[in-house]
């Protein structure tokens, strides 16, 4: 991963640990629903299968990605939890309300939305529509967790940021980078959309929380693009 950009491995460790903790706690609290937006090859429904209990889990992604994921799971003889529902979806084109309703999603239930590694590949309109769906179609107290890419002016001096962005634009030409957000504007961005900011886990916070060793030193520098 570090050939992609320095600190990428450390970033994925920290981001995964952060979201793992949120999902695990939600399951322990028996949250009614968890929705993974752009789930890709996420394995949390498998890794935390013993904690799922009454929770319904929806994984949204493109049909080809989900088909490939299910093939890989079958080849590895990994059982899919009964509570997990694969929902073929294109966040840039399909109506989330209709798509999720057809899959059994209930808008009157407390829900955790996990939107990991996705926003920067979506056009701003799709980001707006997804946040609007969450605001209008989830019970009070529902939570959405998402990461975002910082703006180009902010990248100067950020560890590995410019190299990572350049690499992503070069290697993944079929997935252009379309959405970014200034770090100091996150609270205002959400407030304008009537969403309360509960925690802003910046790179500095993630680094301190998950990469600090017992002697107080850091396990390594971390990519500071997201």
Q: What are the functions of these language-model segments?
A:
Residues 1-39, 43-226:
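Alpha-helical subdomain
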